[in-house]
From Swiss-Prot:
It holds the Pfam family PTR2. The modification Phosphothreonine is found at T138. It is found in: Membrane. It is a multi-pass membrane protein. One of its GO terms (biological process) is oligopeptide transport. Residues 1-20 are annotated as: Disordered. The chain crosses the membrane at residues 83-100, 114-134, 139-159, 184-204, 230-250, 258-278, 378-398, 422-442, 459-479, 504-524, 537-557, 585-605. One of its GO terms (molecular function) is transmembrane transporter activity. The keyword Membrane applies. Keywords: Membrane, Phosphoprotein, Transmembrane, Transmembrane helix, Transport. This is Protein NRT1/ PTR FAMILY 6.1. GO terms for cellular component: membrane. Signal peptide: none annotated.
Amino acid sequence: MVASEIKSPVSVPETPGSSSVHHRKQLSVFFIESDNRRLALGRGYTGGTTPVNIHGKPIANLSKTGGWIAAFFIFGNEMAERMAYFGLSVNMVAFMFYVMHRPFESSSNAVNNFLGISQASSVLGGFLADAYLGRYWTIAIFTTMYLVGLIGITLGASLKMFVPDQSNCGQLSLLLGNCEEAKSWQMLYLYTVLYITGFGAAGIRPCVSSFGADQFDEKSKDYKTHLDRFFNFFYLSVTLGAIIAFTLVVYVQMELGWGMAFGTLAVAMGISNALFFAGTPLYRHRLPGGSPLTRVAQVLVAAFRKRNAAFTSSEFIGLYEVPGLKSAINGSRKIPHSNDFIWLDKAALELKEDGLEPSPWKLCTVTQVEEVKILIRLIPIPTCTIMLSLVLTEYLTLSVQQAYTLNTHIQHLKLPVTCMPVFPGLSIFLILSLYYSVFVPITRRITGNPHGASQLQRVGIGLAVSIISVAWAGLFENYRRHYAIQNGFEFNFLTQMPDLTAYWLLIQYCLIGIAEVFCIVGLLEFLYEEAPDAMKSIGSAYAALAGGLGCFAATILNNIVKAATRDSDGKSWLSQNINTGRFDCLYWLLTLLSFLNFCVFLWSAHRYKYRAIESEEDKSSAVL
């Protein structure tokens, strides 16, 4: 290890009696260019983030690579992945119930667990991309795995050997549990191909947005604008995939059967894979920086070993950093020292006893320590979005059950209940279409931010709108329930009430769509910009992890509510008969939890210190 370039200044006293507070305030003088916020090092590539080609060599002419053309190849891959993901989420519960003859509740729990594990395990994909494979090869490997899983699901739905006997299994027999159950090996096959698909999605999800953002030139004066528009277009591709899944795939399933429906997803993924690989010559790549988990572990171990060392010790030399412009981490710029989480600075505390070539488990660079600080600093923001994911998960089940009791006709056209979740997607599509022409000019006048609102402000707007959405859902469900009881539908919970339209649900759907587009797009952009250079994919995985935890949290909340509200007759807020249950009370509970979560977010966002600013204009926009 190269000797430290940063030495202890003469002006700093080394007497044990010095004030600890004084030394905390002065600690940053041991690192060059220190400040509470990081200056962006000229937004150039001198810090180790030089774009390279697929062979790992620097790109001589950036004009022939990257940009919007390369990004559109990536959009196609994400649209197909989301189409498959939502296509499975909306169809798999029904497939397990109607075809595999599994109980509805266990089918729903199995799919919720699949969705949760798929999203939560995105951290693994982000780790592999940042540590060893790079984002391109991670996407290439896992998108192929995704395709293999979809082909397996298609075969399982198409070949009779993989499903139980369907003869003499009408709807009444199905409800009474008299149909032939799926054999254990048939369920094992289904779960195997399903989780192959899930882990394929987990590898793609944290990498696609980061890889797309990598295609833009950090030295360009329009970089921030391009990045802002990229994440909006990226989420637009996500939305288009969801809309196709909730309409075309549902239609194919109803008209042509399960095999064709899942086959449609496999064909779409195959085409998107071909397009993704066709764009290979255009892509800009970033070199993986080595195992980020190892670097985090080294910082924690080194800080623990030196927990009793003092910054005023006579053995103290300075805070360690390698000389030169580049950091010791491949693909990462140096990160100046910050004054929070002082206890972690012990890992970079260079003592005389460390010698000329100390172990990385005893002495870490300032940049390495700051990486860990950033990861810790980021945690509260995506954590606050778990509540939004919980609400979205509840909507997928609760609002569909509401729709079964309502009139879904548009003139002479009857809309399938399973198509109802398309409306949040349509509202997202509309909001993204109007974002730059309507929202940005209006909010620019209010905030003075050239982009309309900062990333954290957009996350906050999304969380606030989600509170309004779930509050409205509670109001309407209370009205729907009383209407059903007063008009003799109390025990006919699968019968549509002809005079009460399902399109009252559009209000909560559209509001949650608005909440989603502001919160998730703002969060993705925030995590990409704030994550360390060599941990961009892990930063993006934070958002997916929050989504997965939201799925699990919804299951846990439902179980708690059932146990806490069950009466002597076995009825609870979540009774199978929606008209005798109290879904409205659950919506009120979600409203309260969402409000408390929003308060926590405001506190966390107010305390957050942005990692990088470039100008005074950006400084003012960084305040929530």
